[in-house]
């Protein structure tokens, strides 16, 4: 019997939370984004988007801002967090 992707994802997420790794990774990401000024930049971008398109709703603003915000994450932050995730996965997944 093989495990489907949704089940595997669910188990990984559950283990991340139970092991405390989710909180560690999340805190590292938040700290780095705050330190780099990313949060303020995204707030400014969102305000600007709201002023330009006054009739838009949350979903429309999110669809515009989210891709730009993701691009604004620095390479060093992206690599650091991805490295933490890879290390966590290597601990729990048998790749042989």
From Swiss-Prot:
Q: Which InterPro entries match?
A: TF_ENY2 (IPR018783), TF_EnY2_sf (IPR038212)
**GO cellular component term, pick one:** transcription export complex 2
Q: Where is this gene product found?
A: Nucleus, Nucleoplasm; Cytoplasm, P-body
Any one GO molecular function term: enzyme activator activity
- Tell me a GO biological process for this protein: mRNA export from nucleus
| Pfam family, any one | EnY2
Q: What induces it?
A: The gene for SUS1 bears 2 introns, and its expression is highly regulated by splicing, translation and decay. The presence of the introns thereby play a key role for SUS1 function in yeast.
- Residues involved in crosslink (Glycyl lysine isopeptide (Lys-Gly) (interchain with G-Cter in ubiquitin))? 68
Principal cellular location given in the protein's record: nucleus
Annotated signal sequence range: none
Q: Which domain of life is it from?
A: Eukaryota
User: Which controlled-vocabulary keywords does the entry list?
Assistant: Activator, Chromatin regulator, Cytoplasm, Isopeptide bond, mRNA transport, Nucleus, Protein transport, Transcription, Transcription regulation, Translocation, Transport, Ubl conjugation
What is this protein for, i.e. what is its function? Involved in mRNA export coupled transcription activation by association with both the TREX-2 and the SAGA complexes. SAGA acts as a general cofactor required for essentially all RNA polymerase II transcription. At the promoters, SAGA is required for transcription pre-initiation complex (PIC) recruitment.
| Summary of subunit composition and partner proteins | Component of the 1.8 MDa SAGA (Spt-Ada-Gcn5 acetyltransferase) complex, which is composed of 19 subunits TRA1, SPT7, TAF5, NGG1/ADA3, SGF73, SPT20/ADA5, SPT8, TAF12, TAF6, HFI1/ADA1, UBP8, GCN5, ADA2, SPT3, SGF29, TAF10, TAF9, SGF11 and SUS1.
Q: What family, per the record?
A: Belongs to the ENY2 family.
The molecule here is called SAGA complex subunit SUS1
Q: Organism source for this protein?
A: Saccharomyces cerevisiae (strain ATCC 204508 / S288c)
């Amino acid at each position: 019997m093989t495990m489907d992707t949704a089940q595997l994802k669910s188990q990984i997420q559950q283990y991340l939370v139970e092991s405390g790794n989710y909180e560690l990774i999340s805190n590292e990401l938040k700290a780095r984004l705050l330190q780099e000024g990313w949060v303020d930049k995204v707030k400014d971008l969102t305000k600007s988007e709201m002023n330009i398109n006054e009739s838009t709703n949350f979903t429309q603003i999110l669809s515009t801002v989210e891709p730009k915000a993701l691009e604004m994450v620095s390479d060093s932050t992206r690599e650091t967090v991805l490295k933490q995730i890879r290390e966590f996965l290597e601990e729990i997944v048998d790749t042989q």
